Amino acid sequence: MQAFTAEKTELLATYGADAHCGLTEAQAQKNKEQYGENALTRRKPDTLLKRLWDAATEPMLLMLIAAGLIALAVNIVRQVTGGEADFLECVGVFVAIALSVVISVVMEGRSAKAFEALSKINADMTVRAVRDGQTVTLHSAHLAVGDVVLLSAGDKVPADGRLLESTALRVDESALTGESFPVKKDSELVLTDEKTPLAERANMLYSGTFVTEGNGRLLVTAVGDATEFGKIAGELGNAEKSSTPLQEKLARLGKTITVLGVIAAGIVFAAQLIFFAFHGGLHLEAVMEAFITSIVLIVAAVPEGLPTIVAVSLSINIIKLSKQNALVKKMIASETIGCISVICSDKTGTLTENKMTVRAFYDTRWHKEAAALQNEYLTHNICLNTTADLAPDGGFIGNPTECAMLRFFEQADTGNTYRREREDHTRLCAFPFSSELKHMTTISNVDGRILSYVKGSPECVLDMCALKPDRLAELRRVLVQAEEQAMRVIAFAHKELAEMEDFSAKEAHRRMESDMVFDGFVAIADPLRSDVYDAVAACRSAGVGVKILTGDNIVTATAIAKELDLLADGCVALEAKEVEEMSDRRLQKMLPKISVIARSTPTVKMRVVKLLKARGDVVAVTGDGINDAPALKNADVGIAMGISGTEVSKEASDIVLLDDSFATIVKAVEWGRNIYENFKRFISFQLTVNIASVICVFVSVLMGLPAPFTALQLLWINIIMDGPPALTLGLEPGYSDLMRRRPTNRSENIISKGMLARITATGVYMSVVFLLQYKLNFLGAAQGEMTTVLFTLFVLFQLFNAFNCRELHSESIFCHLFKNKLMLLVVGCTFVLQVLIIQFAGAFFGTVPLGIAMWGKLFALAFSVIVLSEVIKVFARLFQKKKA
């Protein structure tokens, strides 16, 4: 049985309640046992162990753990068999793993604490209910199904229920349905269709919504998890978040590196066996050594610094975003936001302020400034013909439309307040607004004159006025102009009465509301946030599409979309019912051209998000209402409003905007894109080193040459590869053209074709030069200097190549050379350390001091890697120019 289709008497009997006396305490306790408490089941927070496990089971970390265990096993075998073990490599891998896990857990723990502080659970909410025939004040958590609750303007509805009585009752359901205007409720309405949409159930009230005017008696029919609010919260708790694009790409990269590492190791192993066979040294010990060398090669191919740079970069971005009023709950979201290609945004409270505002008024022409409000009949009508009020903090008490007009009057600076206007002019009689009459009337004594003030729908009020046909036609044109901009227009008129009489009599009432004087229109709307225009324009230039999915009607939604220029280039606005009638295939095909979906439901939002992701889009969903929560949870990035947002929407999101500013999203996108580019810089650097080292080891084995580096020299090279010089690539500031590039596709590899070409060319070049020096000694190194020269050449190659890796596209490295000052400092310090190692720590590192001439040769030769890169980029720019 659905509460909205059942008779009131039937429901009262079912719950053992009386319409006037409510529940007895005994029945209330019985109902609590049967239907549950009025509290949501809160999901237990993850334990520290669970958070550590989640952080350690990222794809790249799993690959690192495997590499570390293999390296450990190999070195144990070496130790047991009397060989030279190097446990420093193992320590390096496991330190990198621990660092990444700790940073992830600590940063997400900080965000979780901040979120707990932000969340305000409605534990202190009290309600008026009827128990044992007495009106009592109860804690909302103590309500039971069957309780009769008394509600009036300003109250928050504590549970779902069927209306028993209602008087001029209107409720703000924007958090649940997305409808921006308060909805009229009717206790006498009986619905027969069990499929009636939630937004059209006028005989029901729902938990989490607000009474804006009127009063009513509510029979509670659902509490806690059984409410519409609770059902959505429950679904969110059970939903699993899908992997993010970065996680997917890093997983693919990890698999690729592993496969290539295994292939390279297999080739090296086979080459060593062939070499030993030809030279008569093929025995078990040689095979074992060849196998260990191959395994070490696999471990060397793994970029163990990558998880650390990911964790550090994400942490820095979280701190940056927190300073810009964005709380990142899930660390990975601070990068994912940079990859988004579509934002599915709610309208009410996200793009708009969710506060009714007077946009303009009309007397003889339209005025936007409150200071122009000089017509005393219009001002008296606004102040006297209303039941609304403004709170001391500026909040609305009563009908939002009437409150907006009172605020507008206060801004007019007439030298008077609306409260003083009410005190100075006695109200004699009032006829409240009704949906049937579509207007309200107040009769007041104004300076000794009896004046009737009426306001309401323009059609109704214009019919009451004595207007010439041409004036009436002109006013209707004015009216259409305002309505086309999705503004709600209220008309005003007045009439001076000869004397006070009983105007409730039908004939007297008709005379009072005829031959009135038209005073003007007031146009009201929920205005767009001031920063939304620039934010949407920035999204457009960044290639990020914006779609409005709102519970509002098609006219309002279309007007907002036009104001934001979202319906250009053949884009359309549709209603949810049109979307529901489409097949998945047709809808997926049309989605690029659909900019607005009006009367949207949670189901439609979820379907749109799912199909956008299937197309390869990376989707962000913004919202503040309960109805936004499922889509927030299932999007790649869910963004909730921190001020106007409901607790359910915040719980479901990945990022909470503490200032409710849509513009903050644009900043987050920019920083997220920068993080992604920095990952690519770091990966480019590491893979170049890997390719160079693999080729050097492979060819050295084939040529029968001894290992070019000692264990300590390898450790120093590893520090450069994974340490500060490499990490500073992950801190490269964003470039000015970052928000003019297209977003990365979900299926796009983290290593582009251009990157792969540069990585391969640079890696091969460094290897060839290194091996030529090893074999031919074209630098003319003395007999005892060869190891030192090779070691220094390899290190300098990596330091200069770090500058190449700063530019991912075809720009010259000299364009932004001084932008990352930290990198310049770190690379400079590393070079100084290299000089000190060579010149003064030879006994420890197995090197000998080099002369100035040799240092000059090495410096010039290593710098050639930059020259090579710049030449390649010149040709790339010429090719791009020719292609354009």
Predicted region positions:
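Alpha-helical transmembrane segments of multi-pass integral membrane proteins
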Residues: 80, 758-773, 796
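Long hydrophobic segments that form regular secondary structure
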Residues: 774-783
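Conserved cytosolic headpiece of P-type ATPases
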Residues: 1-743, 748-751, 764, 775, ...
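Generic alpha-helical transmembrane segments
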Residues: 720-721, 766-767, 788-802
